[in-house]
Amino acid sequence: MAGRLPACVIDVGTGYSKLGFAGNKEPQFIIPSAIAIKESARVGDTNTRRITKGIEDLDFFIGDEAFDATGYSIKYPVRHGLVEDWDLMERFLEQCVFKYLRAEPEDHYFLLTEPPLNTPENREYTAEIMFETFNVPGLYIAVQAVLALAASWASRSAEERTLTGIVVDSGDGVTHVIPVAEGYVIGSCIKHIPIAGRNITSFIQSLLREREVGIPPEQSLETAKAIKEKHCYICPDIAKEFAKYDTEPGKWIRNFSGVNTVTKAPFNVDVGYERFLGPEIFFHPEFSNPDFTIPLSEIVDNVIQNCPIDVRRPLYNNIVLSGGSTMFKDFGRRLQRDIKRSVDTRLRISENLSEGRIKPKPIDVQVITHHMQRYAVWFGGSMLASTPEFYQVCHTKAAYEEYGPSICRHNPVFGTMT
């Protein structure tokens, strides 16, 4: 272990990618998962095209620079958590490693993350890129949910650390509810929810548009996003919240000021009901999506009920939040209250059906919030990749050359701290 450079930890998400080195508390770089490429008409003979293709392959920008590059088209290699375009992904990783981390890939082991239910073929593609293109000495592909569970140890004592729990991971593009038992994902019980950060932003945008508050149209999306991140919170009861705003508007309405990028004139927006209505779509999804009406608390409860009976109590006891869209004030408290309500109602019904003969043992529902929540997946990866065990479970370049990319289909669970 001595003299070895720290592992690189890269978590590529739908909206943002988190890059950094193992052992650090926070990622060194958080960049949008966007890439700007030149799209030219494919004309001319093959030789000319081959020459220009080599040049084109180097002519691209990623992250914030991608949005500033004029004359380029912006692409997103990841959609809803899954890699959609592997050529773009390879180019994206190339700049992540060389331009941002400024690392020599031959000298560092790598930990990459994958979404739940990622296909084994995708792991093979990842292995091919890392071993063939970057020539890395070792690679480990970790499931995001397991890393998020490990990150929650930051707020717990050593004897409470467990890799059994249910992860509510809500980012920009997708929300997953993932049950994990002893570090292994219970794949058949995972649920995906079509509501995440991007949907909240669009919903706030539409609420502001209805009021016609004088936001420049080309800035309406970024204004909605800024309002979401700065002013939104989760309320315990919508009706009471509306009443609060109506009786004391001065106390609750906030002011957001921005500058028109074209005319440079300042504009102001009064932010009222949007503050609590935006994130409320987690608990009342029908507000923004009439096709989907099941609240998040009910989905978490259903997922746990679908799991094997012997892990249900530990799952209720360790509901871990992860991702930027769980950062709203009082999100954890509201989720815990709603789940506790449905659990207690169920226990009461079973007691009534048995006419009092069966007294069910109360179920302890605990939603864990902690200070590393926003970058939980990256932080969990950073923690695990800084342990000596990490280097024992990594797939090495030698094994890859002997057996091929199929070795990366399985990545052993480690770090259960037993």
Swiss-Prot record:
Entry protein name: Actin-related protein 3
GO molecular function: actin binding; ATP binding; structural constituent of cytoskeleton
SUPFAM superfamilies, per database record: Actin-like ATPase domain
Job description of the protein: Functions as ATP-binding component of the Arp2/3 complex which is involved in regulation of actin polymerization and together with an activating nucleation-promoting factor (NPF) mediates the formation of branched actin networks. Seems to contact the pointed end of the daughter actin filament. Required during embryogenesis for the developmental migration of tail hemocytes anteriorly, along the ventral midline.
Domain of life of the native organism: Eukaryota
GO BP annotations, alphabetical order: actin cytoskeleton organization; Arp2/3 complex-mediated actin nucleation; axonal fasciculation; chaeta development; intracellular protein transport; lamellipodium assembly; myoblast fusion; nuclear envelope budding
A Pfam family that the UniProt record links to this protein: Actin
InterPro entries named among the record's database cross-references: Actin (IPR004000), Actin/actin-like_CS (IPR020902), ATPase_NBD (IPR043129)
Family named by the database record: Belongs to the actin family. ARP3 subfamily.
GO CC terms, sorted: Arp2/3 protein complex; cytosol; lamellipodium; nuclear lamina
Subunit structure, as described in the record: Component of the Arp2/3 complex.
This protein's encoding gene: Arp3
Localisation per UniProt entry: Cytoplasm, Cytoskeleton
